[in-house]
C-alpha cells in the first residue's frame, strides 16, 4: 500500500473528519463566546460595578514618558481587565462543554438501560422449548 493511499484511508476515517468538524465548530463557538462576553455580559456588569470598562482595567507599572531622544516611551502596564474577560469566557465555554457532556452521558445511559431485543434464533429456540414442554 502506498503512503498516499494509507493517508487517504486515515483522513477519511470517521474520527478524523469528526475531529476536523469539531475544531471548526469550536473556533466559531469561541468567537460567539468572545462577542457574548465583551459586548453583552461585561458592559452591564461594568455599569453595575461603577461604569467600569473591564477591557481598560490595568495596573500601570511605569507611566509613558518622553525619552532623552525625544521619542515617546510607552507605559508599562499589566492589563488585568482583559484577563478578567478571558476568564469569564473560559467559564462560559467550560460550562457549555459540561452541559453537552452531561447530556451525552444521560443519552448513553438511556441507551444502555434499554435491553436489546433477543436474536431471532433465541426466540425460535424458546418457542421450540416451550412447545416441547407441552
Swiss-Prot record:
It comes from the Bacteria. It is a multi-pass membrane protein. It is found in: Cell inner membrane. One of its GO terms (cellular component) is plasma membrane. The chain crosses the membrane at residues 16-36, 81-101. Pfam families: MscL (PF01741). The keyword Cytoplasm does not apply. Homopentamer. Channel that opens in response to stretch forces in the membrane lipid bilayer. May participate in the regulation of osmotic pressure changes within the cell. Belongs to the MscL family. PANTHER family: LARGE-CONDUCTANCE MECHANOSENSITIVE CHANNEL, MECHANOSENSITIVE CHANNEL MSCL. This is Large-conductance mechanosensitive channel. It comes from Stenotrophomonas maltophilia (strain K279a).
Amino acid at each position: 500500500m502506498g503512503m498516499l493511499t494509507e493517508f487517504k484511508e486515515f483522513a477519511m476515517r470517521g474520527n478524523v473528519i469528526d475531529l476536523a468538524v469539531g475544531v471548526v465548530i469550536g473556533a466559531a463557538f469561541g468567537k460567539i463566546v468572545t462577542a457574548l462576553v465583551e459586548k453583552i455580559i461585561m458592559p452591564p456588569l461594568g455599569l453595575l460595578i461603577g461604569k467600569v470598562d473591564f477591557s481598560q482595567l490595568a495596573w500601570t507599572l511605569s507611566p509613558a514618558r518622553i525619552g532623552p531622544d525625544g521619542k515617546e516611551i510607552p507605559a508599562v502596564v499589566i492589563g488585568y481587565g482583559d484577563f478578567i474577560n478571558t476568564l469569564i469566557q473560559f467559564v462560559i465555554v467550560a460550562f457549555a462543554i459540561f452541559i453537552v457532556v452531561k447530556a451525552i452521558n444521560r443519552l448513553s445511559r438511556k441507551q444502555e438501560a434499554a435491553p436489546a431485543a433477543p436474536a431471532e434464533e433465541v426466540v425460535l429456540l424458546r418457542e421450540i422449548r416451550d412447545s416441547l414442554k407441552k
